[in-house]
Every structure is written in structure tokens, then in C-alpha cells.
Amino acid sequence: MERHQHLLSEYQQILTLSEQMLMLATVENWDALVDLEMAYLKAVENTANITISSCSSPVLQELLRQKLRSILENEIEIKRLLQRRLDKLSELVGQSTRQQAVNRTYGQFPDQALLLGETQ
């Protein structure tokens, strides 16, 4: 029984961390998300050797299935939010690169008073 309780506790810890990571991704707190991801990966690693099939209790197996389902749903949503952030960063890098090219081009003309993006 104690082993079952320990197993359930391990999965609950992973689920809690997963929910916290989802909340951080939702509010776009990327630095905190990366920091928390290390704890999440460690918790997953700690439970890697324990499998649902090794549990004899059908009730415990169902509880763990529910937790795993929730964890996987959180993972999918976190990945979606991270992809959206990556797309935004790629767009910003592209804009910056184009702006630098324009500024270099216009900067070659000595009679040009202002570079694009500068104010008088």
C-alpha cells in the first residue's frame, strides 16, 4: 500500500509541475517556465522506472491513467504556446534583419540625414 501511495504521489507531483508550467506558458513567463522545466524533468526521471502495469490495484491504475492523461494534455498545450512564441520571435528576428539591411543601404549615402527608424 505504501508503494502505491508513493507512486501516486510521484505522479501527482508531475501533474502539479505540469499545471504550473502551463500557467507560466499561458502568461508568457518564459524564464520561469524554463527554470521549472528542470524540476519537471527531474520528477519525470524519478518515476521513469515505475510503470502502471506493475501496479496490481485497478483503482490505482485508473488514478494514474487520469493523471497521465492530464499531464499529456498539458504537454500538448505548452508545446502549442511555445510554438506560438517561437513563431513570434522568428518574425521579430526577420523584421530586425530587414531593418538592418535598409539602414545599411541608406547609411551608404553621405547626404542622407536620417536612417530609417530614427527621429529628427
From Swiss-Prot:
Region: FliD binding; residue ranges are 60-98
Keywords, ordered alphabetically = Bacterial flagellum biogenesis, Chaperone, Cytoplasm, Repressor, Transcription, Transcription regulation
Broad class of the protein's primary localization = cytoplasm
Q: Where is this region: Required for homodimerization?
A: 1-50
Which biological process, per GO, is one annotated for this protein?
protein folding
Q: Which GO terms describe its cellular component?
A: cytosol
Q: Where does the record place it?
A: Cytoplasm, Cytosol
For this protein, the record's Pfam families field holds: FliT (PF05400)
Please give the family membership noted in the entry: Belongs to the FliT family.
State the oligomer form and interacting partners. Answer: Homodimer. Interacts with FliD and FlhC.
The name of this protein is: Flagellar protein FliT
Gene behind this chain? Answer: fliT
